[in-house]
């Protein structure tokens, strides 16, 4: 069996993609402050805004669940946007679900598309979905969530 990748659509081949990690993007680091930057991003020629995960990050402080980069960083901050706790709600650090809807609508009004980066392959150690689906993670013999 051979696999062939689909060709990218023409609009994508011609697009300018601008990646936004909210925390350092503006002094406020919020969706509201990023919303105010939309006209500027449009003037830059961005067609697609690639938004790093704005959803609720896991705040579990157990170091065994931190990435190597988090452990080496002097900030001692468990919050990592790629270690999510809640895939359905915006992290209060960045704003609200309504702020996200407003950001996307504002981008669309200016003719820009939005890619929302969400990683489903891994999450933090205390995701809200575990209450409903405890079998969604690998556990050790004692029933603790395994890392890695």
Show where each model-derived region lies.
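Substrate-binding/active-site clefts of carbohydrate-active enzymes
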Residues: 3-16, 22-32, 39-47, 54-148
